[in-house]
Regions:
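P-loop NTPase motor core
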Residues: 2-71, 79, 154-215
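Cytosolic-facing regulatory segments adjacent to core modules
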Residues: 12, 17-21, 57-178
């Protein structure tokens, strides 16, 4: 007998986002974020990682899309400080305005949520090193621990396979570090699985192997 009320949510969101996700982001779950190209998937995945860390979860973040550790690190600092390091304006100038969803609704019978209210904020300039240091200090103060909650592993596209991910996680386990949450950004750029498979079959097989990470 399974008690759905006892499913452990590893990452919880407040407000409407919390109602949307409910306990989807729970232990043992496999969740895929789908969007068009340049559709903020990476932003969402980093947000999930950040919230998991704030909730004292061990997070393993794999980037398979050619980003460097510095690239991902800067984006993570942006999320910690809630402050951009690059202007979204076409000409790259400051000040810059950024809007994020504040309220959403899902009509009965619909699969997609609609944003009904946005939060707008203007930034006079880019994120600075001093701001990042202060943001990390506040996060460490909240966590009240010297334990490492975040591990990052970046790889060129088509060079990282699911088997490699499992090996890296096993290596961390030998150091007595065990992830609660495993996030793979650019999963569509993972190396093909072993064996001679058609392109579509390779993609399907990789998704099956990724699912096994949570089991």
């Amino acid at each position: 007998w399974f008690d759905l009320e006892k499913r452990e949510a590893l990452v919880e969101y407040p407000g409407d986002a919390g109602k949307f996700f409910r306990d989807t982001l729970c232990r043992g779950a496999f969740v895929a974020f789908l969007a068009r190209e340049k559709g903020t998937k990476s932003t969402w995945l980093l947000d999930v990682a950040y919230r998991a860390v704030r909730q004292r979860r061990n997070v393993a973040f794999f980037d398979a899309g050619d980003s460097t550790e510095e690239d991902v690190g800067i984006r993570f600092e942006e999320r910690i400080c809630r402050w951009p390091s690059y202007s979204p304006n076409d000409d790259g100038t400051w000040p810059a305005e950024i809007k994020v969803p504040k309220k959403i609704k899902i009509d009965k019978g619909e699969d997609l949520a609609e944003v009904t209210e946005w939060h707008r904020r203007e930034y006079p300039g880019p994120l600075t090193a001093e701001m990042a240091i202060e943001g990390n200090r506040k996060l460490k103060e909240k966590l009240a621990s010297d334990r490492k909650f975040w591990k990052l592993s970046c790889h060129p596209n088509l060079s990282l396979g699911v088997g490699n991910i499992k090996s890296i996680i096993l290596g961390w386990a030998l150091e007595d570090w065990h992830p609660d949450v495993v996030i793979v950004d650019y999963a569509d750029l993972l190396a093909p699985p072993p064996g001679r498979l058609e392109s579509r079959d390779q993609i399907n097989r990789n998704w099956q192997l990724l699912r096994s990470l949570s089991q």
